[in-house]
């Protein structure tokens, strides 16, 4: 019973301190947070071309997408590099395992 009371008290204190922390944000901090959100929205989505900006891919569910490049040969015989944002195979495997674990354990 004492442990339950102590845990409830700790949860109350933590939630109170975190709510005060949110209230203490100043307008400048809010503007910088909004600017960060804007730059996050300007990232390159999955399956879109990232040839000119190889580090600008968005985040997926668990990992950031990687810019994956291939060499394309045109009909003229010229080789060009084309890149797209995608999920690497090892990240796909990790997401599959996590998704399977969530289904099993709830």
UniProtKB/Swiss-Prot annotation:
Tissue: Expressed by the venom gland.
Disulfide bonds: 43-58, 50-67, 57-85, 69-83
Protein location: Secreted
Leader peptide range in chain numbering: 1-19
Propeptide: 20-40
Single annotated GO MF: toxin activity
Gene Ontology CC annotations of this record: extracellular region
Annotated keywords: Disulfide bond, Knottin, Secreted, Signal, Toxin
Pfam family, one: Toxin_35
Family annotation (PROSITE patterns): SPIDER_CSTX (PS60029)
Family in the record: Belongs to the neurotoxin 19 (CSTX) family. 04 (U1-Lctx) subfamily.
UniProt free text on domains: The presence of a 'disulfide through disulfide knot' structurally defines this protein as a knottin.
Protein name in the entry: U1-lycotoxin-Ls1b
Top-level taxonomy: Eukaryota, Metazoa, Ecdysozoa, Arthropoda, Chelicerata
């Amino acid at each position: 019973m004492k442990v339950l009371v102590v845990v409830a008290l700790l949860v109350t204190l933590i939630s109170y301190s975190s709510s005060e922390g949110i209230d203490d944000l100043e307008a400048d901090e809010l503007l910088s947070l909004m600017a960060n959100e804007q730059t996050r929205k300007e990232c390159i989505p999955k399956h879109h071309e990232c040839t000119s900006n190889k580090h600008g891919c968005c985040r997926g569910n668990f990992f950031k997408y990687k810019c994956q490049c291939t060499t394309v040969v045109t009909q003229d015989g010229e080789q060009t590099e084309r890149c797209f944002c995608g999920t690497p195979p090892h990240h796909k495997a990790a997401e599959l395992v996590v998704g399977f674990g969530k289904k099993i354990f709830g």
